[in-house]
Amino acid sequence: MYEYIKGTLTHIDGSYVVIESFGIGYAIMLSERFLVDLRAFMHQEVLIYVHSVIRETEHVLYGFSSRAERECFRLLISFSGIGPKTGLSILNMFPLQELCSIARLENVKAIASVPGIGKKTAEKLMVDLKQKLPTLMPLYLEEPVVPSSTANSSFKEGIGALMNLGFSRLAADRMMTEAVKELSEEASVAELLPIALRKS
């Protein structure tokens, strides 16, 4: 079983990416949301958390931007009637924080709007999600999927500020990385943020 795959992003297709690591190309299925974020990292080193689905005729890897997102996916596919594709569709429509909010408010209609999920399935899913999803939130506060070479406090503060504005952790990392390249690693967060926002 793989925990994560770290390597060079060499190919992006409609529903998957290829990560080359030690001469092996791994095809990894991703949500559309994650695919969009990864486009800025073409031919760069990335780290993707993975979940393996092994069947008689195929071995499929599903990729996620964080351990928390992967554990949420595993929780979703543990429910009867929800397979990997539907689980990925849920995460594509609702980031983990939003999914927690939906579960807390028991918004069955939101879950039922996901293709492949009916009202009855959504109602059953909501009961367990409300109880189990909050336990995953501590995992959400982990390092970005694409570690930056810049580790100064301004960089980290900038990422936090961008995430508070609604950007994903990966997008915030990309925007701040580009801002640092344009200025310098010694630049303050006040100097970096305006430039980072122009990179969105």
Swiss-Prot record:
Q: Name one GO biological process term.
A: DNA recombination
Annotated region described as Flexible linker, given as residue ranges? 145-149
Region of interest (Domain II), residue spans: 66-144
Q: Where is this region: Domain I?
A: 1-65
Gene3D superfamilies referenced in this protein's UniProt entry, alphabetically: 5' to 3' exonuclease, C-terminal subdomain, DNA helicase RuvA subunit, C-terminal domain, Nucleic acid-binding proteins
Database matches in CDD domains: UBA_RuvA_C (cd14332)
> According to its UniProt record, what is one Pfam family this protein matches?
HHH_5
Kindly report the protein's main subcellular placement as a broad class: cytoplasm
An example molecular function term from Gene Ontology annotations: four-way junction helicase activity
InterPro entries (alphabetical): DNA_helicase_Holl-junc_RuvA_I, Hlx-hairpin-Hlx_DNA-bd_motif, NA-bd_OB-fold, RuvA, RuvA_2-like, RuvA_C
Q: Identify one Gene Ontology CC term for this UniProt entry.
A: Holliday junction resolvase complex
Could you tell me which residues belong to the region Domain III?
A: 150-200
**Assigned keywords, A-Z:** Cytoplasm, DNA damage, DNA recombination, DNA repair, DNA-binding
Indicate where this protein resides in the cell: Cytoplasm
Tell me the HAMAP family matching this sequence: DNA_HJ_migration_RuvA
Whom does it interact with, and what assembly results? Homotetramer. Forms an RuvA(8)-RuvB(12)-Holliday junction (HJ) complex. HJ DNA is sandwiched between 2 RuvA tetramers; dsDNA enters through RuvA and exits via RuvB. An RuvB hexamer assembles on each DNA strand where it exits the tetramer. Each RuvB hexamer is contacted by two RuvA subunits (via domain III) on 2 adjacent RuvB subunits; this complex drives branch migration. In the full resolvosome a probable DNA-RuvA(4)-RuvB(12)-RuvC(2) complex forms which resolves the HJ.
Question: Which family, according to UniProt?
Answer: Belongs to the RuvA family.
Give the protein's biological function.
The RuvA-RuvB-RuvC complex processes Holliday junction (HJ) DNA during genetic recombination and DNA repair, while the RuvA-RuvB complex plays an important role in the rescue of blocked DNA replication forks via replication fork reversal (RFR). RuvA specifically binds to HJ cruciform DNA, conferring on it an open structure. The RuvB hexamer acts as an ATP-dependent pump, pulling dsDNA into and through the RuvAB complex. HJ branch migration allows RuvC to scan DNA until it finds its consensus sequence, where it cleaves and resolves the cruciform DNA.
| Note on domains (UniProt) | Has three domains with a flexible linker between the domains II and III and assumes an 'L' shape. Domain III is highly mobile and contacts RuvB.
From the Swiss-Prot or TrEMBL record, give the protein name.
Holliday junction branch migration complex subunit RuvA
Which gene produces this protein?
ruvA
